[in-house]
Amino acid sequence: MKFRDLTSEEIEVRVQSVVKNDKGVILLLYKDARVDQNILDETVTPKYWQKDYYEANGILFCKVGINVGALTGTYDTWVWKSDCGSESNIEAQKGEASDAFKRACFNWGIGRELYTAPFVYVPADKCNISNGKCFDKFVVERIKTVNKHIVGLSIVNMSLKTDNPKDKRCFVWKKEVSDNG
């Protein structure tokens, strides 16, 4: 079973941390659980996938099952992959369930390319930092992937006040490829 790569519109960006002395920010790429649901729906249709939650040793797990038999016409072979989640700071139980689901989907290959993302640093002149905090809205402008690996990425800061869209671009990265591959 092969799932497509994420599009730039499906990837969200958040500030992971502000660098000491407000010198810049470190950004993190992530996806919402709805993205996983949409990709499952479009790839195997809602009829041929399901999820189930269970608890083991006080830890919440989610398992995602896909009816791989539907691909061959037998309709009786379900394959399940699972993982646990961690609580979020906002809604602990909902966040834990969502995280477990996203991790189980990762085990199917959905969004796996996010784990190959480069270190994303944005200097202070490309963002608004005040008292050690940054609330700017960052967006993936473009992403290029090859074999579930990110090889090109650009991010824009929608909070920068400028008339020129190119001036909003705050991070550009292209993977250097050696002669050996």
Where are these regions (language model features)?
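N-terminal helical submodule of small eukaryotic multi-pass membrane proteins
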Residues: L29-V35
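Alpha-helix initiation/capping motif
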Residues: T7-E9, D32, D136
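Short histidine-centered catalytic/ligand-binding loop motif
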Residues: S17-L29, C84-E91
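Positively charged, aromatic-enriched nucleic acid-contacting surfaces
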Residues: V35-D179
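Intrinsic-disorder/low-complexity linker and hinge segments
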Residues: M1, D179-G181
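N-terminal, Lys/Arg- and Ser/Thr-rich interaction peptides
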Residues: M1-I26
